[in-house]
Amino acid sequence: MLKLTHRRDLLVEPACHPRGQGHLSAASGLVQVGARCYVVADDEHHIGALDPDGNDPVQLLRVLEGDLPADKKARKAAKADLETLVALRPTRAWPAGALFAIGSGSRPNRRRGVVLPLAGDGGIVVAARRVVDLAPLYALLSSELATLNIEGAVVAGDDFVLLHRGNGVGGVNACIAYDAAQLLAWLAGDGAGRAPEPRSITPHALGAIAGVALAFTDATALPGGGWMFSAVAEASDDTYADGASSGSVIGFVRADGVLGRMHVVADAPKIEGLSATVADGCLCLLAVTDADDPDLPSQLLSAELQFGAELTGFG
């Protein structure tokens, strides 16, 4: 069993929040860029920037126009559902790299992404953000994944992988792999031209906790082309409704796509976002939670683990 340490709550200045809230409550994706962390929340039009080692309030950066309703039910219906945040490699279009916030695709209004170019110091150039219509990309998946629910993404080796979350009884988790160069070129063109087709769609059975099936929630790249993921056992029968969570796991995937070892996370937090760095044989893991309750702040958790076969399951 894997023990994560509480690092901080994701608190914000109420005066800076569009609804006067003192925290982020639905963290859903996490990327670390140097000494900064960026977090996307699925019920906001902002992303948060924070120092993982500090206590200053999370800075909110607007990525989509307009404000969401204060009512929970109305907000859920209207939100863009930005479930995923992934780091993009430098290209001619964004020389210092970029972040890509991705809508889940589970409803027509949830099929947008936002490319956020980075400055040389790791800050986001908000004025240069690009909103991309992902409907053409998602339409190419409908024949195999009728109820799409994208919850994670990772650039690993030559692949850009989207993680589809299989909800409920009979739901199938899937890794949707694209040629990374093709997908980045399409994004650099603001989604113009024909959307790239996936080169593979691979289903994954992740098991269950307390009889509730595990489903992907996020991923982060590892050295050598492999990656690690988080998955949650949530009792939800579809891609829209939330359900009670029975716990989370952290797992590993080899560069060739083979599933490795999975570790149940102690104390059953609902982990929705994941970021990791590896140095000198140590894996430094950061994770964010979502309690599915707007009155509760999301939390930043961490762990330092020995990176090797005992952890990953690979020799």
Regions found by a protein language model. Give the residues of each.
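Sequence/structural signature of beta-propeller domains
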Residues: M1-G315
